[in-house]
């Protein structure tokens, strides 16, 4: 497992952001994105994106919106030798921020459509089964993911309908799904993580060019 801990060099003139500015910007952005929603469940993998999302929502709850009911749901796919370590990291991350944490282990059947598609199907089945009434699911896809989605659609020869972008507010399997980070880049999330001194997991499979998204990145 690769565990990343990022701390910012505040003397670098190219990056004038400090921790207070980062927290204020992030919480303001998230408050706008969640609107009147108050029962929030974050799909928490422990990676950079979901770590920033979850930490930002916890900060929003603690400083501005105490009525927010925030929890984290981690999916243990069992596909990596480090899967147990990832789950333990996520649990500790949540404990540090007083966020209720739960994890669900799934069996990924990759016979039809490959590992990526099978893992995604398994995740969303868990989400549908575990969300409470009026609870909103939040996932942490960002601007780079949005661009990759478009490029993958082109690579696969999708028609106009298949080239549509991910929606920031949608409905999946009967529940509401918010993606509040879609207009922020990975570089911006790295800035937030640095200023907030977050630690996160780097999945070793992200460097495996056999997976379509990684092929575009490498």
Predicted regions and their residues:
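Core alpha/beta nucleotide-donor-binding catalytic domains of modification enzymes
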Residues: 15-218
């Amino acid at each position: 497992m690769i565990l990343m801990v990022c701390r910012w060099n505040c003397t670098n003139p190219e990056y004038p952001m400090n921790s207070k500015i980062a927290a204020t910007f992030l919480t303001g952005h998230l408050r706008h994105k969640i609107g009147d929603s108050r029962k929030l469940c974050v799909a928490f993998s422990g990676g950079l994106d979901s770590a920033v999302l979850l930490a930002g929502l916890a900060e929003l709850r603690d400083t501005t919106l105490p009525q927010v009911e925030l929890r984290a749901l981690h999916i243990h796919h069992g596909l990596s030798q480090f899967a147990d370590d990832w789950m333990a990291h996520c649990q500790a991350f949540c404990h540090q921020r007083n966020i209720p944490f739960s994890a669900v282990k799934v069996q990924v059947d990759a016979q039809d459509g490959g590992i990526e598609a099978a893992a995604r199907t398994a995740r969303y089945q868990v989400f549908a089964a575990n969300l409470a009434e009026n609870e909103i699911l939040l996932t942490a896809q960002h601007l780079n993911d949005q661009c990759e989605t478009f490029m993958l659609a082109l690579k696969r020869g999708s028609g106009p309908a298949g080239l549509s972008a991910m929606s920031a507010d949608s409905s999946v399997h009967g529940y509401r799904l918010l993606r509040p980070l879609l207009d922020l880049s990975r570089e911006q999330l790295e800035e937030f993580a640095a200023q907030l001194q977050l630690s996160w997991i780097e999945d070793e499979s992200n460097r495996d060019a056999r997976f379509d998204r990684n092929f575009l990145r490498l």
